[in-house]
């Protein structure tokens, strides 16, 4: 949650954390699905990709390398949807550098 907030990504829903069945209608509004634990939720994320074309990030942000890769994948997914000109797009490499040095 913290990394998503820090890089400016708004979380649509966290399933099943405090969600209700009625909120499932909002799932297709997400730009991508983030599945930090492949054993929980990956099948659903694959289904949403097949049905709604919603890509999935399943890199577990644990350790320096995978945390950096996960953030880069988020940046790439958000960048594909961003309407800002390329010169205004956000570069998260300084954030990645700062947080992987302090681990």
UniProtKB/Swiss-Prot annotation:
Binds 1 [4Fe-4S] cluster per heterodimer. The cluster is bound at the heterodimer interface by residues from both subunits. Its EC number is 1.3.7.7. Residues 86-103 have a biased composition (Basic and acidic residues). It is an enzyme of class 1 (oxidoreductase). The keyword Nuclease does not apply. Pathway: Porphyrin-containing compound metabolism; chlorophyll biosynthesis (light-independent). Its cofactor is [4Fe-4S] cluster. GO terms for molecular function: 4 iron, 4 sulfur cluster binding; ATP binding; metal ion binding; oxidoreductase activity. Keywords: 4Fe-4S, ATP-binding, Chlorophyll biosynthesis, Chloroplast, Iron, Iron-sulfur, Metal-binding, Nucleotide-binding, Oxidoreductase, Photosynthesis, Plastid. It catalyses: chlorophyllide a + oxidized 2[4Fe-4S]-[ferredoxin] + 2 ADP + 2 phosphate = protochlorophyllide a + reduced 2[4Fe-4S]-[ferredoxin] + 2 ATP + 2 H2O. It comes from the Eukaryota. Residues 81-103 are annotated as: Disordered. Belongs to the ChlB/BchB/BchZ family. Component of the dark-operative protochlorophyllide reductase (DPOR) that uses Mg-ATP and reduced ferredoxin to reduce ring D of protochlorophyllide (Pchlide) to form chlorophyllide a (Chlide). This reaction is light-independent. The NB-protein (ChlN-ChlB) is the catalytic component of the complex. This is Light-independent protochlorophyllide reductase subunit B.
